[in-house]
């Protein structure tokens, strides 16, 4: 499947508690062999890093797996109870050298390891019992660190089902003066049951219930995420590229292939014009497969 991804796609590689230590290195090797023109973004779970030395050895291993050309990374807090992209403001004691992702960032180990862009987590609805305001305060501290260090920063947000909440969160970020890239979390096509299950697991508000007389398509993967992305397209057109978002952070809960089929259809859909999906460069292998 990596060979079917559009050229230039960022592929975020989560750091999950149950994964073996070399899981991300193996994933990087796979992407290097089978993907073309992809941009890997491995996750560092700060509170699960045993020491600064362990962090530096891990970064070196990742660089080795990608031929020394790895330039982007996403830093999360990494609580065992959190979702793979949750956690900067999540509760729970540190199990390693760092109490939060800012502690790790301030070592400057990422810059020494060759990384030029650091992605951070955005939580429009808050996370793990922490309010959206407190989560934003934690994000603001990390963005201030990036500004002071001259590090390019990006924010990848948790998925939400209420466009008003998500887009209002981005508006507030821009009103604070931040011009960092925002990759907006979007749950890929999946059944209503699965979307609700993932919402519960990731502690976000569930998708709205379909009307009792709704046709079947509104309760399965054929419906979502069209309503959300079309609302996003209208919002983006009103804001412009600089105050809007720069990318989707697609969560393929229903499977990568269905998500790619949806993305390909969305790139040809006039209602999503302005999101830049029409500029995606699909590999020849995608023809007739997606």
Predicted regions and their residues:
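Conserved, mostly hydrophobic/aromatic
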Residues: 42, 142, 151, 184, ...
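Flexible glycine/acidic-rich beta-alpha junction loops that bind and position SAM and/or redox cofactors
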Residues: 81-88, 128, 186-202, 257
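Catalytic-face loop-and-helix region of soluble metabolic enzyme cores
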Residues: 180-243
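Active-site glycine-rich loop that binds ribose-phosphate moieties when present
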Residues: 131-147
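Structured C-terminal cap/extension of enzyme domains
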Residues: 174, 226, 230-290
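Active-site beta->alpha loop and helix N-cap motifs at the rims of alpha/beta catalytic domains
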Residues: 1-136
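Short catalytic-loop micro-motif centered on adjacent basic/acidic residues
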Residues: 12-13, 42-44, 154-159, 247-250
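A structural motif corresponding to the C-terminal end of an alpha-helix
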Residues: 34-37, 107-116, 145-153, 231-247
């Amino acid at each position: 499947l990596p060979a079917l991804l559009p050229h230039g796609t960022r592929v975020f590689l989560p750091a999950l508690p149950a994964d073996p230590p070399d899981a991300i290195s193996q994933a990087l090797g796979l992407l290097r062999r089978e993907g073309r023109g992809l941009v890997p973004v491995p996750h560092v779970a700060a509170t699960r890093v045993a020491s600064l030395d362990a962090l530096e050895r891990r970064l070196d291993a990742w660089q080795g797996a990608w031929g020394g050309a790895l330039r982007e990374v996403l830093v999360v807090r990494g609580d065992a109870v959190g979702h793979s992209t949750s956690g900067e403001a999540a509760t729970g004691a540190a199990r390693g050298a760092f109490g939060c992702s800012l502690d790790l960032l301030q070592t400057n180990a990422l810059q020494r390891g060759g990384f030029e862009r650091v992605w951070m987590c955005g939580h429009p609805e808050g996370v793990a019992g922490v309010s959206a305001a407190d989560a934003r305060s934690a994000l603001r501290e990390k963005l201030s660190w990036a500004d002071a260090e001259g590090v390019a920063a990006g924010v990848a947000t948790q998925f939400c089902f209420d466009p008003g909440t998500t887009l209002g969160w981005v508006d507030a970020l821009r009103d604070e003066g931040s011009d960092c890239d925002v990759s907006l979390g979007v749950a890929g096509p999946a059944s209503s049951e699965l979307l609700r299950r993932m919402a519960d697991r990731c502690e976000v508000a569930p998708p709205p219930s379909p009307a009792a007389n709704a046709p079947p398509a509104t309760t399965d993967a054929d419906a979502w995420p069209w309503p959300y992305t079309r609302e996003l397209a209208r919002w983006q057109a009103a804001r412009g590229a600089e105050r809007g978002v720069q990318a989707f952070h697609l969560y393929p809960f229903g499977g990568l292939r269905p998500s790619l089929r949806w993305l390909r259809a969305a790139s040809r859909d006039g209602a999503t014009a302005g999101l830049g999906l029409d500029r995606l460069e699909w590999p020849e292998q995608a023809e007739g497969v997606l």
